[in-house]
Amino acid sequence: MVMTDPIADFLTRVRNANTVYHDKVEAPASNVKKAIAEILKQEGYIKDYESVEDGKQGIIRLYLKYGANKQRVITGLKRISKPGLRVYAKKDQIPRVLGGLGIAIVSTSKGIMTDKQARQSGLGGEVICYVW
């Protein structure tokens, strides 16, 4: 079966694993997914991630993070720009997620970055997803 939106599949795997309190989640690797995982790690939403070579595409493995009493660190993940409806934002129209409590992951001409980094760099781009 051909996957039409690999990023949405990746986010859904993370969301589902987070819902049932799994310690780790695996997905087929790509450079975009690695960049998203790096942002999630920098922002403190996951413990760590690693890329595992399997002779084909490779696998990206994320180690999920939970607070005291199994409180989820990631409370929500939402795909914004989809293959059927791309969503772009100019540098002065980059959205704030929950008034700054969450992050928007934006694909810019300088790479994939958070909404805050894009605002500081004065760059717009495709809004990939929201994380809160």
Curated annotation (Swiss-Prot):
GO molecular function: rRNA binding; structural constituent of ribosome
Pfam families: Ribosomal_S8
Alphabetically ordered keywords of this record: Ribonucleoprotein, Ribosomal protein, RNA-binding, rRNA-binding
Gene Ontology CC terms: ribonucleoprotein complex; ribosome
Highest taxon, organism lineage: Bacteria
Keyword Metal-binding attached: no
GO biological process: translation
Family: Belongs to the universal ribosomal protein uS8 family.
Purpose: One of the primary rRNA binding proteins, it binds directly to 16S rRNA central domain where it helps coordinate assembly of the platform of the 30S subunit.
Subunit structure: Part of the 30S ribosomal subunit. Contacts proteins S5 and S12.
Name the record gives this protein: Small ribosomal subunit protein uS8
Organism (species): Desulforamulus reducens (strain ATCC BAA-1160 / DSM 100696 / MI-1)
Gene: rpsH
